Regions:
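Extracellular/periplasmic, surface-exposed regions of secreted and cell-surface proteins
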Residues: 1-213, 217
Length: 218
């Protein structure tokens, strides 16, 4: 019997604080400096944002007699993109089981190696930033801040993909022929998309959730 386990935590922190200035050159050709930009054609834009995801995770693999292996993982994320919603954190697990048949059962000589496997997993991710609260946008044409085109949504949830997989790995004739066959299916939930808003709302579109989207099979 064997056991391997891992426990950890991480913080992914990304920030941007930038100002952009563009326009025609003033006097000196090919001298690209803000002091050489024509003030009559110059346009300024600013960008400032801060994303952070805090995570804890764990995994464990249990093996028996070098034949049967069980793998379990789990991860929980707290994402700043989900601020102002009721779903500030999200958990996604996985479990997998594999069996080395060639180590357990006497097979015909033509079969050098045989393993069967199965797994089920969830994968989650946050929506884009600033979709859950009012966020003014900068108009470089008028140098003013304006209402956003999209109406924010405080009911957003993390995008979630659930999938399961069955597979076979086999080798034949002294490893001269290899076979790797997989059958899987996955469904994606809570995808973010935009729909046209009523003109009287003052917005161009609304931010909504698509509940599920089945994927093709292999």
């Amino acid at each position: 019997l064997s056991l391997n386990a891992t426990v950890g935590a991480s913080i992914n922190d990304i920030q941007e604080d930038a100002m952009y200035l563009k326009g025609g050159l003033e006097q000196i050709p090919n001298f690209f400096h803000y002091g050489n930009i024509n003030v009559n054609t110059s346009k300024r834009n600013e960008s400032k944002w801060h994303d952070q995801v805090q995570s804890v995770f764990a995994s464990a693999e249990l093996g028996w007699n070098h034949q049967l292996y069980l793998t379990v993982t789990g991860r929980n994320d707290w994402a700043s993109q989900l601020a102002f919603t009721s779903k500030g954190s999200y958990f996604y697990p996985s479990v997998g089981l594999s069996w080395l048949v060639s180590e357990s059962v006497k097979l015909p000589k033509a079969i050098s190696y045989l393993k069967v496997r199965g797994s089920w997993a969830e994968v989650a991710s946050s929506p884009n930033r600033y979709l859950t609260q009012m966020q003014y946008t900068y108009n470089e044409q008028t140098n003013t801040y304006e209402y956003p085109a999209s109406h924010y949504n405080t009911n957003l949830k993390p995008e979630n993909t659930k999938s399961w997989e069955l597979g076979v790995n086999a080798k034949f004739l002294g490893n001269r022929i290899n076979l790797d066959m997989t059958f899987y299916r996955s469904n994606t939930f809570n995808q973010t998309f935009y729909v046209d808003a009523s003109a009287s709302s003052g917005y161009k579109n609304n931010i909504c959730l698509l509940y599920t989207s089945p994927s093709p099979r292999d």
